[in-house]
Amino acid sequence: RSSDLFVADGGTAANYKGAIGVEGDEVKGCDIVAPRLSFGWTVYKPKEIITVAYVKSLASMVGRTNASAFLSFAAGELLFVGASGSRRAKQDDWELTFKFDASPNVSDITIGDITGISKLGFDYLWVAYEADEDDDAKIVKPQPRQVNVERVYRSADFSPLSINA
């Protein structure tokens, strides 16, 4: 992230410390594409494994993140978004495709003067601001007061998926 600041001759640029779209005491922010990858992993399972209990187990993992390392992704980096499948009559088994979103865990984030922030891939980070007087620029501007990292997805053990990578 970087900023270029431009002011009129004789003016002094305000340091918003990473806040974007500042209007008065409000920070509007901006929409960006978050690092995220969607992928499917196809496996073949014997017909005896695909039971109602197995399907219910899959359903219980939808919308959960990985509680431990899985498919070489660290805990918190995978979100299980579902599965689809069909029976293959000739092979007498099931073809299942597990669907995931991946987003990297991030550490050493700095927002304003707040350092040492870290978040898991699917955590939601938001910032609370307070008014700060900038004597040089002669304005009152928002200053990051607190960074909040919210765990919006529960985690689950993905080992019952029995994916061999």
Could you describe each region identified by the protein language model?
Residues 1-165:
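Compositionally biased, intrinsically disordered low-complexity segments enriched in polar/Pro/Gly
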